[in-house]
Curated annotation (Swiss-Prot):
It comes from Escherichia coli O81 (strain ED1a). Belongs to the IMPDH/GMPR family. GuaC type 1 subfamily. Homotetramer. Gene3D superfamilies: Aldolase class I. It catalyses: IMP + NH4(+) + NADP(+) = GMP + NADPH + 2 H(+). This is GMP reductase.
Length: 347
């Protein structure tokens, strides 16, 4: 046993210090990034935000809506091959290039993903997703996927430390998904005691990944557009959002009614709700590590997308970054004990 004495920080622990700027307007900021990925060799350009691969966020409807903003969607793994075929038949190549095909690590997952990728060559992203990316089995699956799909861009996670980030990149991942426990409907930290404050995880993993020519996506912990800006400021190449995109018309959650008001259910993918829906219940050897919440209906996701992108542009203007790519170079974090004036929050 040992204790690391240095302080680890989450998004709520910091603010971005403003700096002199030559930008005249938020409209001068370029949010689109262009990437060429280490292993696949593929190039992609767009806004590097990803809708999370949760079945109440990462839906086909969400992918279609967010593609118009050049935002990616990691489509959840519970759609059938037939449902994928129907979606592809009704979607343009421009939508498909903003889609990630999500998979687990079982043999059945591998075969199903292979069938989906064979449906259309425009599907260039694979998201290999497990709660604990530290297992040897997971690393071996990433290597197997890289061998099977040498020209596909592979995103794999989740991890929170530099050495595991490096191992996944060396095993074939182009993008490493970073985050254990920060999600809005994740209870891993309270059920297991395991986790890592998200901003510090992003900073550590970005440093490790960029040294090898890899990239990272910050997954979880964002509650506001300001948090998205902090994730990019900390070095994230991509930011994945779940709760911020939940509760919309495109989110796919079940709608319930209470006292005449309608709500949409949103739950973590390790929650009892998710396991009952997809595997028949919580196995006797494990505990649920997610919760279910009822969200007021939030309308079309386009309004939220515009709010997030607007906040991100504004953050860039405050530090003089004319492009999103420059944000991390222009970011100085200050540690704080307050984020906002909350006097009217309960009104």
């Amino acid at each position: 046993m040992r204790i690391e004495e240095d302080l680890k920080l989450g998004f709520k622990d910091v603010l971005i210090r403003p700096k002199r700027s030559t930008l005249k307007s938020r409209s001068d900021v370029e949010l689109e990034r262009q990437f060429t990925f280490k292993h696949s060799g593929q190039s992609w350009s767009g806004v590097p935000i990803i809708a999370a691969n949760m079945d109440t966020v990462g839906t086909f409807s969400m992918a279609s809506a967010l593609a118009s903003f050049d935002i990616l969607t990691a489509v959840h793994k519970h759609y059938s091959v037939e449902e994928w075929q129907a979606f592809i038949n009704n979607s343009s190549a421009d939508v498909l290039k903003h889609v990630m095909v999500s998979t687990g690590t079982s043999d059945a997952d591998f075969e199903k993903t292979k069938q989906i990728l064979d449906l259309n060559s425009a599907l260039n992203f694979v998201c290999i997703d497990v709660a604990n990316g530290y297992s040897e089995h997971f690393v071996q699956f990433v290597a197997k996927a890289r061998e099977a799909w040498p020209t596909k861009t592979i995103c794999a996670g989740n991890v929170v430390t530099g050495e595991m980030c490096e191992e996944l990149i060396l095993s074939g991942a182009d993008i490493v998904k970073v985050g254990i426990g920060p999600g809005s409907v994740c209870t891993t930290r309270v059920k297991t005691g395991v986790g890592y404050p998200q901003l510090s995880a992003v900073i550590e993993c970005a440093d490790a990944a960029h040294g090898l020519g890899g990239m990272i996506v910050s997954d979880g912990g964002c509650t506001t557009p300001g948090d998205v800006a902090k994730a990019f400021g900390g070095g994230a190449d991509f930011v994945m959002l779940g709760g911020m995109l939940a509760g919309h018309e495109e989110s796919g959650g079940r709608i319930v009614e209470e006292n005449g008001e309608k709500f949409m259910l949103f739950y973590g993918m390790s929650s009892e709700s998710a396991m009952k829906r997809h595997v028949g219940g919580v196995a006797e050897y494990r505990a649920a590590e997610g919760k279910t919440v009822k969200l007021p209906l939030r309308g079309p996701v386009e309004n939220t997308a515009r709010d997030i992108l607007g906040g991100l542009r504004s953050a860039c203007t405050y530090v003089g970054a004319s492009r999103l790519k420059e944000l991390t170079k222009r970011t100085t974090f200050i540690r704080v004990q307050e984020q906002e004036n909350r006097i009217f929050n309960n009104l």
